[in-house]
Every structure is written in structure tokens, then in C-alpha cells.
Amino acid sequence: MSKTRVSNLAEKLGIDTKEVLARLKALGYDAKAGSSTVDDEAVAKLTASRPAESGPEEVRVTTNIVRRRSRPSAAAEPEAEAPAVVEPAAPAAPAVAVEKAAPVIPERVSVVKKAVEAIVAPAVTEAAPVPAAVTAHVDAGTAAEPAVAQEASPAVTAAKPVPATPAAPPQPERASATQARILGMIEIPITPEARPYRREPGRGPGPGGDRGPRPTGGQDNRGPRPAGTQDNRGPRPTGGQDSRGPRPAGAQDSRGPRPAGPPRDAAAPRPAGARPVQLTQVDLPPQGEERRKTLGPNRKPGGPAKDTAADKAKKGAAAKGKGREQLSKQALLSREERQFDPFHKSRKKGKEREEPGKTELTTPKAIKRIIKISETITIGELAKRMGIKATDLIKAMMKMGSMVTINHVLDHDAAVLLASDYGYEVENVAVDLDEILEFTPDAPELLQERPPVVTIMGHVDHGKTSLLDAIREANVIAGEAGGITQHIGAYDVELHGRKITFLDTPGHEAFTAMRARGAKVTDIVILVVAADDGVMPQTKEAINHSKAAGVPIIVAINKIDKPDARPEKVKQELTEHGIVSSEWGGDVTMVEVSAKKRLNLEELLEMILLQADLMDLKANPDKAAKGTIVEGKLDKGRGPVATVLVQEGTLRTGDYCVVGVHSGRVRAMQNDRGERVLAAGPAMPVEVVGLPGVPDAGDIFVAMTDEKQAKEIATLRQIKQRELELAKHAKMSLEQLYEKIQKGEVKDLNVIVKADVQGSVEAVAESLRKLSTEAVRLNVIHTAVGAITETDVNLATASNAIIIGFSIRPEVKAQAMAEKEGVDIRLYNVIYDAVDDVRKAMEGLLEPVFKEKYLGRAEIREIFSVPKVGNVAGCYIQDGKILRNAQVRLLRDNVVVYQGKLGTLRRFKDDVKEVATGYECGMGLENYNDIKVGDIIEAFEMEKVAAKL
């Protein structure tokens, strides 16, 4: 005979385990817990006793409420409408019903109040589930149906036993179209069919009792509540006794008039009294499985539902231990509305939480499809402007062959190309600073004559500075290292009451950029050519610069006092480059001078003034100054100092100015003789103090009256320069990336260049960059004007670089730090020495080359077989010498058949280190015995040779 667990039996019968234990005990079976087992006989007795133990169904109705109930058949109607007669079927059942129903009194009053407030005239009571003691015999798939009615006289519905099987089959889940719900969640049947509520097996019937407020806001689909004692609960409120007074149907509802409900069931008789209020059809709470999830876990039949841990957690945060009955009716109703209004948006501290919607793809208007950029734009910013993903643009760039990232800077052309693929246009709205600072042409009557600006050019050591020194009658060449002019000098010379401004440029090949700048700011070029040397490479370069700038040339043939001077040969060589003397029918003035003997200097100055008169040089001194930076340097006492050649207007002390990316105020000015001046007119060179940084040679100097505008222009230039620097980074294609991987063994030499003036910095850096080869790359990682500081040493330490100082010295702390960190600092005064030393350092980075050195050769004349050694060759040294540790190759008919090391070298059984020419010896080859008479053994060694660039 099989056994059945009590817990499984309770689940099968749909009642609580304790109830099953009580019934088994009443039947005489000793079952103590849910894990106990009973036989089939006990199960049969317990199942057979279920109908006899079912108690009455009590439904209490207020004096003005009539309960309408759908019946499965017409035969059941008299029973439903008969007077209520409560007949307890078992002695224990009524007691359970009364005891368990007591705790539900507050909830019933609260629910009735909510129902009264929710409808207009009559009250609607919420259907409560039948207690387990009364409905223990009800099938797990059946439940009492809620009802709504209205009546003037009291009525009581009869309690009737419910059969074990329902009279009508269970209906499927009700569709939303046949459901009605009012805020407050009172379920109203609209169709006449019976809709029994199917409970989940093992859960037991619907609960009753005082559960407190539900988290779901008051929806209760548990059927009619069990009857309680009238004296415990007090009078129930009626629809007309609400404290707020009767509310007309549909008149005060903010939602407007409610639509009429579906037609009534023809089989059901109309109850006496007023017509029930028509209710609007809204969404009902979830049915079936979803409803069972909402109702919670198993509950005891017939008793008050006990809160589970989840229910307590939900109610504890909101109510903090207080029942919903302690809230006011209005607050409770508003909470019910908030919780069950599907269109209500939750609000927290005034902030709305809106549900995120799907992103709608829209096409921007034509005017919005124009992207405005300033010179450059990053890929991420361009993607943001176009509203697409940056990865799409990166893929497009990769298809074009460029490896880029989201922060890669695109120039205008690349941005146009990318944007056009997505239907966008790119417009360059960069501010043209040249237009802002452009000077309008002056009226002819405002122009005044100005001195000419003369630039002296020529090859190295052809006497340019000596000639200028002779003209100025001042010995400035003594301060130049090696007789080479290192940077531009600007000077004023007066002749016959007229001034001439001279610019001296270096002749070294590294100073090409400085010569080009000098040609652009000058009016006349004096080309100095040594009579004993002729036309040299820098002479040709100066001619090309002058022609490119459209500046007239005056040739000064210097050093005519030397015995080997040949001026005619110089004129002939100049003719080959398009410089034809006026004596030979050309348009170029040539003057033979001697700077050392001071010959024909005045004639040269007169020719300069004559050429200036022909050019009719004029300028307007009565306006804001504009000029060019000839040179910039960092003075230890005065800070950044700029040599400015004023070209237009007058520069005064106190003027605001813009120079490149710097803006400042002119604090002081002094001329080439060190004298302080308050104003500088056109064609006058001055040194300006007051700039925040060292400007680059060749920058335009503009004086302004508004400090704010000067700062704005400088800021814009800084932004533009930063964008251009980012865009300078080489765009690496896939092929270039592959080549870079292949060249992974290339050596790098990092260099930091510091000099006294900006021009020297440029010259040294450019000369060093030209030393780069495919084997060794030279990277100039930093250049600046001024002394070597601790910052430079830190940078050199981090980047493993050497520091080259040109005409400067390191600071004391920087020198100590360099010695501590092992940073190499090289100081030079002549650019040749710097270039040579760096070239040697680059050669030191190269791997040494192994070169074969020939030692000698020997002929095999006899072969000896030695046990445990092998074959030994008896040789005669024909040439050179054979060393013990030398490498050898075996030649047979001038073909190399073996190359390796010499195993043994002996003379008369003695090991020797070497054997010279003319001697005989025995030699054994390492791991090789195939030797024959007549073979030649050639000895050599590999030695390291330093690699050259």
C-alpha cells in the first residue's frame, strides 16, 4: 500500500497543511507534521469527508446594497435569492469563520469607504474571498464572484454549500474589452457568464483578514469576504452618508462623461431600488498567473493573510509599520490613483522621470547640413556635428589608407571629403587675421621720405661684417667667434644728413632662412664678393633670394687690396648668373672696395642713396606702427628682447602690440648703439622690451591701441598654431606602417638645441636635421632661446637626449643636475664644430662593421693520420703568417670547400701561437678531415670597424 505525504495531500486538496493535520487527527490518524505519511485509506476517508465539512458561505450586505450574482443555471436562482439562513455543517467551521474574520474589520471599512468615494451615488463593496473554513470544499479552480448592487432596504444572501465541482466550466482569462475597473480596483462583472477564479494548486482559498494596504494599490479579486460580527465592526458607511456628500455620477469627474457599459444579462432579474451606476471600462489587473504573482504566496484558509518577507519589505519602506487605515481618505485615494493610473508619470522632488523613447532618424534641413570649422577639426567632433558614429568615419579613413584615431585632426580638405559622403558640406570660417590687421593704403599727401633698408649678403668670410664695420667705424667683428656672423645685426648709418639702415646676415649655409627674411624686408641688397675667391655657393643663393624678392642688387667686390685680387674675373662669373655690370651694358652697379683699407666706401654709400632716390621710398609716420621681427633673444636681465624693423608708422613706448602668438606692451626701446629712444619711425631698427615670450624671426609686429583686441588676436593665433601642430603629425598609411615595422632597427638620436638668439636656434636645428640618414634618425625634440635650465635637463633625461648649447652656458643647478643624471651637454660657439660632433655621435649609434683581415696562406704537402685526432696536414707557409686562433678556409682548385676555425697548430710536436712565412708546420682543421695534398689553407681574422654615416 502506497504512502502519501501530508504536505502533498494538502497541496492536492488545495487546503493548508495544518488543516489537513487537524482533519486527520479528527479521523483518528496520528500525523504530526507535513512530512508525515498516511496510507491510501486515510486519503480516501479525508477526501470523502470534505463535502460534509464544508461550512456555510456567509455574505454580509449593508442595508442599501443588493448583491447580484451570476448563476450557472436557472435552477440555482431560487437558492441565490432565498433569505440568508446560516446553517453550520460542522461544529468547528463556524468558530473558525468567526475567529478568523475579526481581523478583517478595518480593511472592510476602508475598502467600503474607498468604494463609496470611487463611484457616484451608491456604494460599491469590494468582494472578499471566502474563508477557508467555509469554502474548504470548493474546488481549486472556483471562487466566489464579486458583486455590485444598490438597494434601499436591507437584504441578506443565503449561504449555500458549493459543490466540489463547478456547475459551469471555468472561463478563460477575461479580455480587456470585457473588464471594468475604477481607480480603487473594484472588479465589476459586465458579462452574465460566471467567471470562477482559478487558484494555483497548493495555495489554498482566497485570504481574508487584516492584511493592511497592498503594494499594488488596493486591487482585490479575492471574492466575497467572510462574515464577521456586526457588533465588532460597527455600522458600515452607505453611499449617501459619505462625509463628502453624494457625488453626481459623471458630473465632477475630470475625465468627462463615462460611456455606458455593456447590456445586462437578460436572465438576471433587475433588483429593486435605484439603477446601478454605469462604470467606465478600463484596464483590469492581470489575471491568471500574473494575478497569482500579485496576490502573494500561500495563505491559511479562513484566517487573516500573513505578510511575507517581501510584503513586509515593500510596506515597511512606505508605511514604516503603520496601516493604511491611519491615512486620510483623500490621501489614500490619491495614492490609489497614482499607483494605478497608467498614464501617470512618477515625480520625485519636482523632477520628472520620462521613459526613454526610441531615437528617431531625421534628415536635417539644408541650412543645418553645413558644418563650419576653423582650419581643422577632429574626427570625433566632425562625427558629433554630423550625428553619426565616430567609428564610421574612422572606417572611412582606413578605407582611404590612413590609420587614424578619434582624436586625429583633419584639415579642411579631408573634412570636406568625409562629410560629402554623408551629404554634408564643410565651410571654413577661420578668422583671417591678416584681413583684420591689414593696413589701408595711405593718401599720397600723407607719405614722407624714409631711409632705405640695405641688407648685406655674401659667402662665408668674404668680408660682409668687415665692410659694415668699416662703414660704422666700430669694431664689432672682434666679438664674433671664428669671424663668422652668427645672427642678424641692424644698424643705422648717417651720410650727408641722410640715414641708411643696414642689416647684416650670416653667410653660413645653415642660415638660409635668415637670408631669405633679410631679402624680404629690405629695399636694396649689397652682394659682397671677395676678389680673390670669386662666386661661391652662398653667393649664388643670395642672388636667388634677391631676385625672388624683386630687390635691386649692388655688388661690392671686396678685398681688392690683396695681391691675388681679380675683380674682372668676379664680374665674368657674376655674368653667368645674370648679374651684368653697368660698365658692360647691364643694370647692376658694381663697386670695388676694400674694407680693410677703407677704399671706395663713400662711393658705395652714394650709390646706395642714388638707388634709393630712384626707388622713391616713402612711408606714413603718423599712424600705428607695423614692422618685422629681425631677431629675437632671451636676455638674462631684460627678458625677451625683439629686434624690430619698423616699416610703417611710428612705434612709441607704451604701445600695445601683437607679435605672432604673443601680445604685450612696449616697455622700453633702444637703438643699435644702446641708447634709449621713445619713438621709432619708418626704416628704423630698435630693440623692444616688454613681450611675454621670444618671437620668431620674421614675424609681423603690429602696434595696437586696444589691449583687449591685441590679446584676442594672440589667443586666436595660439589656437590656430596648436591645430596646425596637431595636423602636422604624419598621416600614416597602411603601407607606411608596414615600412615602419620593417625599419624597427633604425636608431634614433634625440637632440635639444638652445641658443642665444632665435636665428641661431633655427640654423643649428636645420643643420642637424640634415644629418639624418636611413640608419640613424636625428630628432630635434626641443628648441628654445636662452640658457640651459633644469627643465631642459629633465626633458633630456626622460627622452635620452643630448643638449647642444650655442653661444650660451648652462645654469649652475642645471649643470649639477646634468652631472647627476648623466645628461651630455655640449657647448659650441661655431656651428661647424656642433655639426661635426653630432655626426660622430650618430656614427657611434651604428653597429660596428666587421671587416675581414687577411693573415696568410699555407700549402698542404703531406697528410698524417693521428689516432683520436684525425687527419693532420703538413703545410708550408707561403705568405704571411698563420695564427693559432685564426679562422681558415680550405681552397681546392680555388673553390672554398670548408670554412671554420683552426683546430691545432704545431711545429715538431710543440703547440705554437703562430708560424711565419717559410716555415713548415702541422695544422688540423676543427671537425673536418677531408683534406688532400695540394689544397690551400688561407688564414684570416674579423676585426671591428666603426660605421660611417
UniProtKB/Swiss-Prot annotation:
Region spans: Disordered: 46-82, 145-176, 188-361
InterPro entries: EF-G-like_DII, IF2_II, IF2_N, P-loop_NTPase, Small_GTP-bd, T_Tr_GTP-bd_dom, TF_IF2_bacterial-like, TIF_IF2
Chain segments carrying region G5: 594-596
Bias-annotated ranges (Pro residues): 163-172
Residues noted as binding GTP in the record, renumbered to the chain: 458-465, 504-508, 558-561
UniProt keywords, alphabetically: Cytoplasm, GTP-binding, Initiation factor, Nucleotide-binding, Protein biosynthesis
Domain tr-type G: 449-618
GO cellular component entries: cytosol
Keyword Hydrolase in annotation: no
Protein localization: Cytoplasm
Biased composition (Basic and acidic residues): 334-344
GO molecular function: GTP binding; GTPase activity; translation initiation factor activity
Highest taxon above the source species: Bacteria
Location of the region described as G2 in the Swiss-Prot/TrEMBL record: 483-487
Region described as G1: 458-465
Keyword Nucleotide-binding: yes
Matching HAMAP family: IF_2_B
Homology family: Belongs to the TRAFAC class translation factor GTPase superfamily. Classic translation factor GTPase family. IF-2 subfamily.
Protein name, per record: Translation initiation factor IF-2
